Curated annotation (Swiss-Prot):
HAMAP family: PSII_PsbJ (MF_01305). InterPro entries: PSII_PsbJ (IPR002682), PSII_PsbJ_sf (IPR037267). The keyword Amino-acid biosynthesis does not apply. The gene is psbJ. One of the components of the core complex of photosystem II (PSII). PSII is a light-driven water:plastoquinone oxidoreductase that uses light energy to abstract electrons from H(2)O, generating O(2) and a proton gradient subsequently used for ATP formation. It consists of a core antenna complex that captures photons, and an electron transfer chain that converts photonic excitation into a charge separation. This is Photosystem II reaction center protein J. It comes from the Eukaryota. It is a single-pass membrane protein. The keyword Chloroplast applies. GO terms for cellular component: chloroplast thylakoid membrane; photosystem II reaction center.
Length: 42
């Protein structure tokens, strides 16, 4: 992990990690919400 090419910007690996966590959280929340919604409606 070197800082080459990241002058004044956020490291790409950090952006990828945060984005991955957010995407997983949103997808999990979406599936959980749809599962609970379908379970309660059906």
């Amino acid at each position: 992990m070197s800082n080459v090419g990241t002058s004044g910007r956020i490291p790409l690996w950090l952006v990828g990690t945060v984005a991955g966590i957010l995407v997983l959280g949103l997808v999990g929340l979406f599936f959980y919400g749809s599962y609970v919604g379908l379970g309660s409606s059906l």
